Amino acid sequence: LVVDRGGHGRTLRTIADAYKVQALQGVRWTAWKALYAATRGAARALHLEHEIGSFEPGTLADVTVWDWAVGAVATHRDAVARDLHERVFAWMTLGDERNLAATWVAGRELYRRPGV
């Protein structure tokens, strides 16, 4: 699952679309599996898991900070979530580029939404 392509701004849409494809094929894809596919799993598929895809010391990291809920529907869904998995699932399936709060690349902050 490629979600780190610079500049496209549709990370959460990509994850949500992948979830839908999995569901249509009868595969139960949890929020944790989706996060793995977008991070460590993608690095592993490229045979780069020792260099990227995690926060382990010595690895390279581009970091994106997200707001949990932006907009009325997502805010309500976040408020009624029973656990962390439900919060992450709602964020992944209802979120979009408006949820982006800040981005760091190679240790430098490149973007911070006003008010964050």
Feature map (PLM): residue ranges:
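C-terminal cap of metal-dependent C-N hydrolases
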Residues: 60-115
